Amino acid sequence: MSSIKIECVVSETYKIGESPVWEEKDGTLLFVDITGQKVCRWDPGTKKVQSVSLEAPVGSVVLRKSGGYVMAMGNTFSALNWQDQSVTTLTCVDEDKPNNRFNDGKVDPEGRFLAGTMSQEIRPAVVERNQGSLFTLYPDHSVVKHFDMVDISNGLDWSLDHKTLYYIDSLSFKVDALDYDMKTGKSSNRRTLYKLQQDEGIPDGMCIDAEGKLWVACYNGGRVIRIDPETGKQIQTVKLPVDKTTSCCFGGPDYSEMYVTSACEGMDEEWKKRQPQSGGIYKITGLGVKGIAPTAFAG
């Protein structure tokens, strides 16, 4: 494990860096700053970040097959045209809950965009409980709700055989598994896969590797952990130099690099002095495992 290398590749400090997605065609990393209300794109070649400022918190962003991106922003699924920075609302959710916003999301292997909601944070990781839901945006822009009574809807991904959806509601301190019907996009039979240890922090964003193991970024835990879904056991921990690790994805030319986003919101001056690169983006190499290319939204 001594070959693992961790470097801060984007030192700009984002309030809540999240939703990293590798965009293969340009070799760039897409991500959001949730409360900074931005979608950003980092080019490893130029080491520059371009960003688009938005009018609401943006929980997640995904690639779109027809070009541009789709965001889970505020209480909307919205399209973003990167060239002219225009935003088009596709549909709204949770209209009876004005204090709710979207959080993490990801596209399933068939091109549907799943994203969940939560109430706006009172302070980091403190929310009005049970206000969120998990939704699917279908390619025809219709929306289906999977379930409600969620605290902080967070990381999700699918098993390599596409039969299982892995899902995190952060304040349950668990990673759950659900049966997933890839034909219809419906989920059922939710159960606990892994319960986090106290020192591991709060489960946040998540991705799967090419060996079918899950990687979970642990907020306030300063680490990503690797979980074997077959055994429900944690099999690896990689610690980072910042506590507020938020999400992770694989990227790079062969998907052998892991990118980890982080946050600085809610940190006092003394904490920031100790961890000045909180809110930056980290690259981990030498993990010895590759990731899976993200799917683009089909609609």
From Swiss-Prot:
For this protein, the record's InterPro entries field holds: 6-blade_b-propeller_TolB-like, Regucalcin, SGL, SMP-30
Q: Which Pfam families match?
A: SGL
Gene Ontology MF terms: calcium ion binding; enzyme regulator activity; gluconolactonase activity; zinc ion binding
One GO term describing the cellular component: nucleus
Q: Which sites are catalytic?
A: 204 (proton donor/acceptor)
Q: What is its EC number?
A: 3.1.1.17
EC top class named in words: hydrolase
* Pathway listed: Cofactor biosynthesis; L-ascorbate biosynthesis via UDP-alpha-D-glucuronate pathway; L-ascorbate from UDP-alpha-D-glucuronate: step 3/4
Q: Know the name of this protein?
A: Regucalcin
Task: Give the originating organism.
Answer: Xenopus tropicalis (Western clawed frog)
Identify the gene encoding this protein.
Answer: rgn
